[in-house]
């Protein structure tokens, strides 16, 4: 629907040009940016291949041996009888890495806007596990028929949402009294060395069309969440990467949703040589990620 709206507006603008009407070029540029970003995200998240490349780098080279997904699971404080919803589940890694820790008497609904992602998650978890169900929907329009939940999880999801406030308000509607919302993000220092690396090779490269942490990040997340939730607290995941092999880092870079694939293929050999040299003695990458833990505001209307 969003893409159809953007494309209709572009057609209307083209018609205005042909009729020699005044064109709002600022609005036009915003729409072009939105079109490029949305199509990029759609291509990136049709299935789990690109997201797996990003997760793989963290799995191989994180200094903290606990691991991101086991740590997230610990913050969830899951216990018997809980009804849980994950928004934007991706390939289901949060659950495949924690299956043995989950009690038997719980129900977990995995959701994603991408049917391809859900297929990958179902395949990874196993479609026969009665604790799990899989639903495709946009988190801006959470179906009321799903019922209410003790816990809602949004792992690195909110900064992709067009209307974060609307998503938060929808979450409050499906949380039970005393229910919790766990949403992860990162800050301005997160993976900064990777961006500096590619820009030292070609300053035109940007690994993200937007600075996602400016949309929803560690620095501004409390202000964004506070109108909808109470007792909003931030917990950092203490970690860093020491990358000692070029290929996983290159795969990570190529999987990002920026413009790198416009500039790297023609000079791939030179870029690979640069990354290989940087990783020979261990390439340090800062991680600045964590979670906001929120409780429902009972009187929100």
Which residues does each PLM region occupy?
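A short SAM/SAH-binding and catalytic strip from SAM-dependent methyltransferases
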Residues: 1, 151-164
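Conserved class I S-adenosyl-L-methionine
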Residues: 2, 6, 16, 20, 24-79, 93-94, 182-204
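Conserved Class I S-adenosyl-L-methionine
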Residues: 9, 14-25, 29-32, 65, ...
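Class I SAM-dependent methyltransferase SAM/SAH-binding core
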Residues: 85-141
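A short acidic, Gly/Pro-enriched loop at the edge of an enzyme's catalytic core
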Residues: 140-152
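A short glycine-rich, Lys/Arg-flanked "PGG" loop and its adjoining helix->strand segment in the class I
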Residues: 165-180
